[in-house]
């Protein structure tokens, strides 16, 4: 029997937890599922996507990139643009057929929203 994996919940370092929570809510349409200020940790969710945010005060310059898949790239792009998200790349068709656009969060982490070619 093969065990099926079903979801992923990336853990992303942020420079200011409160500011990042606000950004994910206001600019990307996520809701707070869990907030633990004393542990500098939160989980934000939208649909079936959960992103774990943790405050990293180490001053290291590592940033994270994640892919989130959608069935309607144009509608999502318009929504996030209207919310004032930091779009770092508009909608592009990649050589392999997927269409995507990129957003940077308030800590510089990159989120790539992708519509697979077969959608």
PLM-predicted stretches and their roles:
Residues 1-19, 64-66, 114-119:
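N-terminal beta-strand motif that seeds the catalytic metal site of vicinal oxygen chelate
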Residues 29-34, 87-89:
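Short secondary-structure junctions
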Residues 18-31:
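Amphipathic alpha-helical segments
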Residues 16-17, 66-110:
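Vicinal oxygen chelate
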Residues 31-64, 110-115:
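Conserved short beta-strand elements that form part of the metal-binding/catalytic scaffold
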């Amino acid at each position: 029997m093969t065990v099926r994996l079903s979801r992923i919940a990336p853990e992303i370092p942020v420079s200011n937890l409160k500011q990042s929570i606000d950004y994910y809510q206001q600019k990307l349409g996520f809701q707070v599922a869990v907030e633990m200020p004393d542990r500098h940790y939160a989980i934000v969710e939208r649909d079936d996507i959960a992103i774990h945010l943790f405050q990293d005060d180490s001053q290291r310059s590592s940033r994270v990139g994640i892919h989130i898949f959608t069935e309607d790239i144009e509608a999502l792009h318009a929504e996030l643009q209207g919310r004032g998200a930091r779009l770092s790349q508009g909608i592009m068709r990649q050589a392999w057929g997927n269409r995507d656009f990129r957003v940077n969060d308030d800590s510089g982490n990159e989120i790539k929203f992708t519509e697979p070619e077969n959608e």
